[in-house]
Amino acid sequence: MKFTRTLVLASTSLLATVATSQAQEVKRDTKKQGEVVLKPITIISHGKDNIEATGGTVLTYKDIEKLQPANVSELFSRQSSIAVSGGGGPSKRIHVLGMEQSNLAVSVDGVPQTATSWHHTGSNVIDPAFLKRVEVEAGAAAADSGFGAAAGAIRYETVNALDLLEPGKTFGARIIGSYGTNGRGFSGSTAAYGLKDGFDWLLMLHGTSGHNYKNGDGTEILGTEPAARNILGKAGYEFDGNRIDIGYERSRDKADRLIKMNMGLPGDTEYPLEVARDSVNIKYTRTDATDMWDPEVQLYYNRNDYWRNDYQNRTNGNMILKEDLYGGKLQNTFTIDYGKITAGIDFGKHDYNTDNYGHNDRRYRKFNTQQVGAFTQGRFEFDNGFSLSTGARYDYSRFADWNDEVFSDSGASVNGTLSYKFNEHIEVFAGASRTWLGYVLGDYGYVHARNNAFYTDPTFSPGRARNYKAGVNFGGADWSAGITLFDTRIAGLPNYDSQKLGNDPEEYRSRGFTLNARYIWNYTTIGATFTKAKVTAGDDPVLPNSGSFMPIGDMATLFIDQEIPDYNMKVGATLAWAGRISDEAATAANFYDQPAYTVVNAYAEWNPPAVKNMTLRVGVENLFNENYYERTSFAPSQNRGGIDPVWAPGRTFTFQTAFKF
């Protein structure tokens, strides 16, 4: 019955896509040339989704340049819907509306990324120094967002030579150096890029070196020293209307870290840890695409390694984890009078390898998953005020476990978002999706502590998700505002108990609303966001144990940016607030209440008139030296003799100089 209902929904979505061929013409953009306005509030614009219009987040290159983020906490510091837990780089976990990013389809330059490997490590993330754009599509994600988009999608996009080259130039270089107090130490980034005879290339290096930071009370937080060593390389070639792009990203973090990076245990000790990530991809597109022929072909390979030395004679995080993910995508986009339709196939294989140094009766485990899917997504904008984004995909999933037991199944996913624009200032929308997730392995690192008898339950089944959202957008030439109500439910997730891998019986749910507003006046931009979310497992609130689902309660941000062109200056500030969290379930599980906190960051930037290619910047994080731990961190607890959170850094100044040639 469940499959039949899903098939009916998928068929309805596909029929809606086809039926729009009889619809009216798309509404044309009537904005006057040179007029300064915010992005239109409509959910569809020129055949593309407007992520922000449905409660999502978009960070442009200009946004990222303003923030100059040293880590992902600073990258998302202006987004109340996104929480990042504290600690050193490899320990940071990203939660969207209280759901860890592994529940979303995460990609870098279109390449799918692996999920979080172990519940005591951070989310797999890219170096913010390489980014030019980030999109966070919360809730109902499009069918072409990728496989397994249970709670939405996160799309990271890195810079290339064409983004950095000055107009009319064929070669350029950029050097950025900074020094930070409170353990931040030195950070350096260099980039060279060029263009010649249709060939463009870029090479960028970024490294950090520092010490453990101190929290607002002056206590050193172990295992938090910056230790990134990252490389980004890209090349593109255009010929006869064809374009080929090749990209390589290398990430290394090697330092002494806590046994369990997301929590402070009594008598905690640091041990060497290396986290490595390598990604290679090649993509083919057309520069002379037509309405009926706009192809994209992509192949990729990702490798993620977690290595920790054998520091004790039992399983406790001393292990080796290796993942290989490879696959590809073939799609074509059709442009018609009223929008665009994208259709294609994607596929991937994910290999897992674990080594626990022989601290139980099985040292090594190898297992894998495979996926093949077909998808279509249509995005339409009509002159009667309606816009529609709808699509479907069908996937096959296969799981072969460490005992050579094989599980396979297939399922359909469907999504749709419909909006109506009353006038140029008001738009309402509603959307829903039902997503088939295949076999979800989640934090597979659990198996390092399981013995040889550990097996997969024969009834182990694929996961599934449902998303609902609705809202209203308001806007004008210099202001915008919106409210989005959301409800996400995910079931069929894995449960690694002491005897077997099976399905978690609980349905996890995040529901609530987000608010956003922005106003632009001459050289001043003011913005604010607010998020209220209730995250539950079954009927109970989730526990603040740094899991895949975390309580976030009420969170808000307020920011301002001011340009001072007469002095070649820019200044800005961000305020982030999180409300107090207290619930009976957490108290019964020996967690303390989570106190409210308010944190202020600020920056000032200057371009000396005598040296136009130089920028000087000073920034301060946690201006008032608040002693706090970021929401979604492991909360303090009486368990295990007393658990402390990984406290966030106290006041930290950063001084930066940048040259561009």
Curated annotation (Swiss-Prot):
CDD domains: ligand_gated_channel. Its main location: membrane. Gene3D superfamilies: TonB-dependent receptor, beta-barrel domain, TonB-dependent receptor, plug domain. It is found in: Cell outer membrane. Residues 48-159 form the TBDR plug domain. Heme transporter. One of its GO terms (molecular function) is siderophore uptake transmembrane transporter activity. Induction: Induced in absence of iron. It is a multi-pass membrane protein. This is Heme transporter BhuA. Pfam families: Plug (PF07715), TonB_dep_Rec_b-barrel (PF00593). One of its GO terms (cellular component) is cell outer membrane. Residues 170-661 form the TBDR beta-barrel domain. Belongs to the TonB-dependent receptor family. InterPro entries: Plug_dom (IPR012910), Plug_dom_sf (IPR037066), TonB-dep_rcpt-like (IPR039426), TonB-dep_rcpt_b-brl (IPR000531), TonB_rcpt_b-brl_sf (IPR036942). Keywords: Cell outer membrane, Membrane, Receptor, Signal, TonB box, Transmembrane, Transmembrane beta strand, Transport. It comes from the Bacteria. PROSITE patterns: TONB_DEPENDENT_REC_3. Residues 1-23 form the signal peptide. The keyword GTP-binding does not apply. The keyword Protease does not apply.
